[in-house]
């Protein structure tokens, strides 16, 4: 994981602007502690903080075209870069082995209309010095964070995290996933569109002769295999839940051979390391241990105490840049775990984010009234992932210079999984959620894991973690403070004391209105969208993101 920051639309280059860009970049150096690079020329400044994963020796950034007329700063991984390189063999002169350099080749060939060619996670800024134009773009789902801003002088700012823009420009906002901004057009435009974003009554998408479980199995194994490309040690996050267990089992299947040689040579680090964190005796730790023993990873179990978690919250909110209750709850143990992972020399981990959104894994999905409602909710959840789980996974890990990859959100896998008939994914009543995913990988996991009920990460690390947070924040925030919450926080007024507590810390770090508006604030039950609250009358009086809020479904419901 890297960090990018910079300024466009510069009329006259100055030392002051260059120093400003340097200060912006320093704010996100935790994302890329290995090297710093900067371009300053024409009407642009591009800064890059590097975490070296692919081609550590020559892949420093910014990257330049062979004639140095185009310059590029990227935070991301392009998983199909070898295929693209092959297409441009003899047509484009590559200077490095960096996976991201293919963006320059594509731009030189196709102009700005090349983004669909990429399969990867990315946020980038490209400056064409010859044309004095620039292009900013973000990956389809928003796995990689990106923000865009402006000032009164007409400068356009960009940064991997909002802390790179806070105090440096007049206003900013999250850069939308699946969008690009081209200086000639002057507005953000969508580049990523799919037929599955709209529900179709007549399911004409099942042309594939393979069973749904076989389609899922093949597509996910291919996604994990693609995402194992690395020139540095890597591992897997293994919570003991279904999603991380599936990813870990597939990764273990391919870990012994080097992906970059198509399995022709042994892997540089053939032992796959898995990592789990929780309070002592937490449900996740017990299950993670069972999975690790079954699939054969070198497993590392990290315990943290309630006090250690509480002590970290202020730092966690600074790094993850949100006051969303669910995200803070889940980010804290992940932040603590990332520190241990980095201390062991691991720079990249695979994680299980995205499966619940794709397959309707959150427990409230049991209440979906029909296939249309179910499918439309999965699409809504995917469209908001950049504000929640993607943000958590990326920034919690990046705080310690660790990159997170998410195979469930692989572009090709999404097209397979989201085109399945939603009836196949539904789990009415007591039917277990994500049944099609469980069936696809049941033979790779212990039975007790393959058919284990969904636990949200913040629950699975230990129920007392959430219970303690509720208790502490209920005491720390008075009834009078809550009564006047709208006066103190007119933008996205906190809906409960826990949110008020996190919001107060967030405001200390990021006092601007832009920062406040960058965080979503909606009623939710078990991580639902606001629209899904209509599925059950019991949801109307609830605002609790924990899965235990879904009575009649969760085995340990309140």
What does each model-found stretch correspond to?
Residues 1, 8, 343-350, 369, ...:
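Adenosyl-5′-phosphate
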Residues 1-323:
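Cysteine-centered catalytic environments shared across enzyme families
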Residues 17, 95-99, 118, 209-216, ...:
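Hydrophobic (often cysteine-bearing) scaffold residues that line and stabilize catalytic clefts
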Residues 314-318, 364-366, 464-467:
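Short low-complexity, flexible loop/linker segments enriched in glycine and/or proline
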Residues 324-328:
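Acceptor-substrate binding/catalytic loop of class I
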Residues 340:
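Adenylate-forming
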